[in-house]
Amino acid sequence: MADLFFGGPFRRILYGRPFPPDWASASATAAMDWVETPTSHVLRINVPGLGKDDVKVQVEDGNVLTVRGAAPHAAAEKEREREKDVVWHVAERGRPEFAREVALPAEVRVEQIRASVDNGVLTVVVPKEPAPARPRTRPIAVSSKL
């Protein structure tokens, strides 16, 4: 009975190649957490298998933080797959490169941003500008001429 459903034309629909190898854009996005502490913004981005030389972090005009990464073997692997007579059956692992842009708040110290990679997680620490001192209000006694 299962052969009736999973065999023939249904097998091709259910298990066939739904998308060509380039179904995803060249730049996929990476999962990210963004938390704000009293002194900084902390971004943690999943970069499995990438080291510090495989990730580029920069701030563009308008306080846009850009993070890009690519596996060192990605280009060579991609070329080998194009040269061979390769048939893709499943493509679930995503692309070996990614890009992520984050609009940072205006009150950050761009020149003090730090980034590090550890166990497949890129951590970017963006220090905040200190809050401006609140103006102190002091009552002034008003006298009248009598």
UniProtKB/Swiss-Prot annotation:
Assembly and oligomerization: May form oligomeric structures.
PANTHER family (alphabetical): HEAT-SHOCK PROTEIN 20 FAMILY MEMBER (PTHR11527)
Lineage: Eukaryota, Viridiplantae, Streptophyta, Embryophyta, Tracheophyta
Official protein name in the record: 16.0 kDa heat shock protein, peroxisomal
GO CC annotations on file: peroxisome
Entry's family note: Belongs to the small heat shock protein (HSP20) family.
InterPro entries tied to this protein: A-crystallin/Hsp20_dom, HSP20-like_chaperone, Small_HSP
Organism: Oryza sativa subsp. japonica (Rice)
Residue window of motif Microbody targeting signal: 144-146
One Pfam family hit: HSP20
Chief localization: other
GO terms of biological process kind: protein complex oligomerization; protein folding; response to heat; response to hydrogen peroxide; response to salt stress
Record-annotated sHSP domain positions: 23-143
Keywords tagged on the record: Peroxisome, Stress response
Subcellular location, record wording: Peroxisome
GO molecular function annotations of the record: unfolded protein binding
Induction line: By heat shock.
Gene: HSP16.0
Disulfide feature: none
